[in-house]
Amino acid sequence: MGNDTLANMITCIRNANLRKTKTVEILATNTNRSIAKILLEEGFIDELRERQEDTKRLLVITLRYQGRKRKPYITTVKQISKAGLRVYSNHKDIPRVLGGMGIVILSTSQGIIIDREARDKQIGGEILCYVW
């Protein structure tokens, strides 16, 4: 049984949002790094850093909140494609999340990208997760 680092990342972000924690540390894999960069570009997180701890490289994600009540910018993160059931889509069938308010993160032949880029480039791929 292998480690599902994407599921771990999603769970850490979800739990941190529930506890209103400022930062989250996750294992730095290429997939996690790419997804975190997308979240930073789309404005869901405030900051992204990498740090070395002994032999492990960790991503330190600073979550973004709004207002005095600290409402998280990431309302929901939902993993779609899982180890037991992969979900693929061509560019025409990529779903829209909340009418375009959320994003779909895909793994394609051109790297990990969001749904808008995939539609523009007319490429499909594996649907990793929804974020809104």
Curated annotation (Swiss-Prot):
Top-rank taxon of the source lineage equals: Eukaryota
Q: Which InterPro entries does the entry mention?
A: Ribosomal_uS8, Ribosomal_uS8_CS, Ribosomal_uS8_sf
Where is this protein found?
A: Plastid, Chloroplast
What's the chief localization of this chain?
plastid
Q: Name one GO cellular component term.
A: chloroplast
The Swiss-Prot or TrEMBL record annotates one GO molecular function as: structural constituent of ribosome
What biological process terms from GO does the record include? translation
The protein's UniProt keywords, in alphabetical order, are: Chloroplast, Plastid, Ribonucleoprotein, Ribosomal protein, RNA-binding, rRNA-binding
Q: Which Pfam families match?
A: Ribosomal_S8 (PF00410)
Please verify whether the record's keywords include RNA-binding. Answer: yes
Q: Give the similarity note.
A: Belongs to the universal ribosomal protein uS8 family.
By its UniProt entry, which PANTHER family does this protein fall under? 40S RIBOSOMAL PROTEIN S15A
Q: Subunit comment for this entry?
A: Part of the 30S ribosomal subunit.
Cite the HAMAP family for this sequence.
Ribosomal_uS8_B
Q: What does this protein do?
A: One of the primary rRNA binding proteins, it binds directly to 16S rRNA central domain where it helps coordinate assembly of the platform of the 30S subunit.
Protein name per Swiss-Prot or TrEMBL: Small ribosomal subunit protein uS8c
